[in-house]
Design a protein with these regions (language model features):
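Hydrophobic pocket-lining "lid/loop/helix" segments that shape and contact the acyl-thioester
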Residues: 1-86
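Cysteine-centered functional microenvironments
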Residues: 84-98, 118
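Conserved beta-strand-centric core segments of catalytic alpha/beta enzyme folds
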Residues: 98-134
């Protein structure tokens, strides 16, 4: 179970060794709290209440992950679904570009509104940025 890619020469590896394989359940259990913690910490450091964020454009891994991360950040399960645009329903998992794709399709903030763009992926890497429309 590798959670990262290995640099490898094709002539020295079998086809099974060249494949990228993750245990979906463990990724879900590990990544959701990690991403929620990063976003929450970032908002706290910038004195932003999570409930004051107008949109969360998250990596489009799957709907369950997106909803769980948002519910952990917002500390509630009953939030407006428009807070977390999910083009994954129409376009599937777009890998690293998923959060930016969601942002591009749903960039409807008003001046002064804040949002969070967050991507995560292979190797349990996570990055996040807070944006504010001016």
């Amino acid at each position: 179970d590798y959670s990262y890619l290995n640099r490898c020469a094709v002539d020295q590896k079998t086809m099974d060794e060249l494949l990228f394989d993750q245990n979906g359940r463990s990724v879900f259990k590990d990544v959701c709290p990690l991403v929620a913690s990063l976003i929450s910490s970032q908002l706290e450091k910038n004195n932003i209440n999570p409930n004051d964020v107008s949109k969360f454009w998250l990596h489009q891994a799957n709907g369950k992950m997106i909803r769980l991360i948002a519910s952990k950040v917002l500390n509630k399960d009953d939030f407006d679904p428009s807070l977390i645009p999910m083009p994954i329903k129409q376009f599937g998992n777009l890998a690293s570009v998923g959060s930016l794709f969601a942002f591009n399709l749903n960039n409807d903030l008003n001046p002064g509104d804040k949002g969070v763009i967050c991507s995560f992926g292979a190797g349990y890497s996570v990055c996040s940025i807070i944006v504010e429309k001016i």
